[in-house]
Amino acid sequence: TNEVMQRLRHLLRHQKRFVRDASHQLRTPLAVLKTQVQSALHGDVEPQQALHEISDTVDRATLLANQMLALAKVEQLRQQSAPPATRFDEVLRAVALEISPLIAQRDLDFGIHTEPALVQSHEWMLRELSRNLLHNAVRHAPPGSELTVDLRSDGRHVALTISDHGPGIDDELAARLFQPFSAGDVRTGSGLGLAICHEIVQALEGSIALTNRVQGHKVTGLDAVVRLPLPAPLTDSAPTAQAAQ
């Protein structure tokens, strides 16, 4: 059918773009790694220092590769129909517990409030969304500051709000925050973390926004807000057995 052909064409375009972007992005850490190895072989740097630098480069390349695979997985799951219903609140609390050592390391005053929320989504998507947003907030929250997570439902949507007390974001940067591999994305390092979040939210027919909190003329922090639709309530429109008789 036309719908199937459109989905196949979309998938093919996405795969071509992914291969092009992936090859371009991996070229940089591989070039850096080669330079570091050559410097070590020539004795330009101390062996211990060279090993530390090489290890850091490998870690960055591994993170980048994993994030690119996550982007590809989002598209793969998007093509599947009828995702299961998943408790967003349970996933969110599990991720918060998972990164609690990072929160403690930065001595953050961390608070989390959740309400039961059932979302039509693969658990992996909600987990990846929560992990990327929380990691981003923890990394950029000033040590010893407050970081709050709030998940609430209004009956039609569930809203996740993550509020930090960091420096916020520049207006110029905000326009390209959710683009894969965006240059100058200082809040995500490789420029993929928020792009993954954006793709997941789009796949779930929701919205995501990053907004500076301002008091007077001073930025006091950043709010990351995700809104996802709740499943429509089931309606029994079929006739009962008694009515059929």
Where do the language-model regions lie?
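Acidic ATP/Mg2+-coordinating residue in the GHKL
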Residues: 164
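Short helix-loop "hinge" at the ATP-lid/N-box region of the Bergerat-fold HATPase_c
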Residues: 137-138
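Conserved micro-motifs of the catalytic ATP-binding
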Residues: 76-81, 114, 118-124
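Short conserved segments within the C-terminal catalytic ATPase subdomain
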Residues: 102-112
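Short conserved segment of the HATPase_c
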Residues: 169-181
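Amphipathic coiled-coil signaling helices used for dimeric signal transmission
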Residues: 1-14
